């Protein structure tokens, strides 16, 4: 008897269901796949070096041969015939080394494809990753932070290890542009068929774009977009080398970039979910009261950009609980006791009075956004409570103490006239006193005052200066005062010049 078409389709679907559920998973692993396997959501690509920055081939210049083959794109397969290989040799007293430039800041590691060697045993090498030539040449000091030394506290960048005679090996997980390889094994010769950087990234389209008649400004825009793109790992990091953590304050300018360049991306809601799980109330986000304020601002901006009411409702209890937590720490006279430590960003930390004024403005901003969130959630009592907190905070408005971070927040929140804020401090000295985190809010203050040309000039001066020094992504910290007599990051530092990364960076 012939089965009815609908029944036949149902039986076929039932039979095929297990195969569909485990599609792409080897049969041997399928029984445990749901319990122990997590799919890697990131993409990988292999990148050939763009140039050889320096090499040490011994006093007779004979320890390295045919290094130009490393600049050719390979197929990733090892070979034992030693054809088209870079040959590196060491003696008792001299060790060959190469320093490679991959052209742009990357996140990932390194892949060595071997072409055999003079030893049956593995050979000892030292591999140093660097965001600058200076860092790739530097010595590590992990016991204490010292100028001119590098650290491995967030991502291992200085690795001494054995590599195989044949085959291939992958090393590292960090942020870098440069790699130095030293052959430490005495009296050994190794053949390197390929040295490739492993780029680990999200394969997503650039939906937003910016183009004008100022090519420097165009390059600044795309560099900012790429900087954030690299930080979009499984979660949204503050940086690909350090700290590699979801910081709720650093997230805000990243969120604004993502929404304009990439549109909706799950890295934002996933990171906000993770933050709430890591720091349940009454804990402060990242252990910092200021970053709980940024959480509310981030929630508002994400809803404003996406209209995702379901995600907002998912966080309604946390939002309400945080509003009530803050309310209990602001008295009727406008005095607040959220936490003993006040924080805006690291460059401003020395100006205690200015930070205090800016921190209070940040509370007002967070409550303004929390008011809107509460209305969207239909929680009118919380919405009114936010207004009450704002009114109490406005009873005690402190001076900015010539701190650009503070004046910018005060202008954004309406605690200070934007034009006055710009005239008194934000515009003074142009890009001097700007920072890589709070520079966004300084530009917002300039825009509120209608100072658009001034803002563009500062963008070209401050962010453009990093490009002039060889940056391919923007740095965690930067100050225009560092520029005089500074060497670029993409060449060895000459004697008498400042190492802008080693002397000032991390």
Label every model-predicted segment.
Residues 247-253, 257-506:
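Active-site core of glycosidic bond-cleaving carbohydrate-active enzymes
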């Amino acid at each position: 008897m012939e089965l009815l078409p609908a029944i036949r389709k149902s039986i076929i679907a039932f039979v095929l269901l297990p195969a569909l559920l485990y599609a792409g998973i080897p049969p041997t692993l399928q029984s445990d796949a749901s319990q122990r396997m997590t799919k890697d959501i990131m993409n990988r690509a292999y990148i050939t070096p763009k140039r050889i920055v320096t090499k040490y081939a011994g006093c007779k210049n004979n320890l390295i041969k045919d290094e130009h083959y490393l600049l050719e794109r390979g197929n990733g397969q090892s070979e034992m015939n030693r054809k088209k290989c870079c040959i590196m040799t060491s003696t008792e007293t001299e060790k060959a080394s190469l320093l490679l430039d991959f052209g742009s800041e990357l996140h990932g590691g390194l892949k060595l494809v071997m072409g055999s060697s003079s030893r049956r045993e593995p050979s000892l090498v030292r591999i140093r990753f660097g965001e600058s030539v200076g860092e790739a040449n530097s010595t590590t000091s992990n016991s204490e932070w010292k100028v001119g030394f590098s650290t491995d506290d967030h991502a291992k960048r200085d690795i001494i290890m054995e590599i195989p005679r044949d085959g291939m090996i992958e090393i590292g997980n960090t942020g870098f542009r440069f790699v130095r390889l030293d052959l430490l094994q005495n009296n050994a010769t190794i053949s390197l068929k390929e040295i490739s950087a492993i780029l680990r990234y999200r394969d997503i389209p650039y939906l937003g774009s910016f183009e004008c008649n100022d090519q420097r400004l165009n390059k600044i825009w795309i560099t900012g977009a790429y900087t954030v793109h690299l930080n979009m790992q499984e979660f949204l990091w503050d940086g690909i080398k350090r700290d590699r953590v979801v910081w709720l304050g650093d997230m805000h300018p990243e969120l604004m970039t993502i929404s304009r360049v990439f549109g909706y991306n799950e890295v934002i809601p996933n990171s906000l979910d993770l933050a709430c799980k890591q720091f349940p109330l009454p804990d402060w986000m990242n252990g910092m009261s200021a970053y709980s304020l940024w959480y509310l601002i981030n929630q508002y901006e994400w809803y404003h950009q996406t209209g995702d009411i379901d995600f907002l409702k998912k966080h309604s209890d946390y939002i309400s609980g945080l509003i009530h937590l803050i309310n209990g720490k602001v008295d009727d006279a406008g005095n607040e006791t959220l936490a003993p430590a006040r924080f805006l960003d690291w460059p401003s930390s020395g100006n205690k009075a200015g930070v205090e004024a800016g921190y209070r403005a940040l509370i007002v901003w967070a409550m303004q956004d929390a008011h809107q969130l509460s209305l969207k959630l239909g929680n009118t009592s919380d919405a009114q409570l936010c207004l009450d907190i704002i009114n109490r905070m406005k009873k005690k408005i402190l001076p900015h103490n010539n701190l650009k971070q503070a004046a910018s927040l005060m202008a954004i929140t309406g605690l200070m006239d934007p034009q006055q804020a710009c005239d008194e401090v934000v515009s003074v000295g142009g890009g001097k006193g700007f920072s890589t985190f709070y520079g966004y809010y300084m530009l917002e203050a300039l825009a509120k005052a209608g100072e658009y040309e001034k803002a563009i000039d500062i963008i070209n001066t401050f962010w453009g200066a990093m490009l002039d020094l060889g940056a391919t992504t923007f740095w965690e910290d930067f100050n225009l005062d560092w520029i005089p007599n500074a060497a670029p990051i993409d060449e060895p530092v000459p004697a008498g010049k400042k190492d802008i990364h080693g002397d000032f960076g991390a």
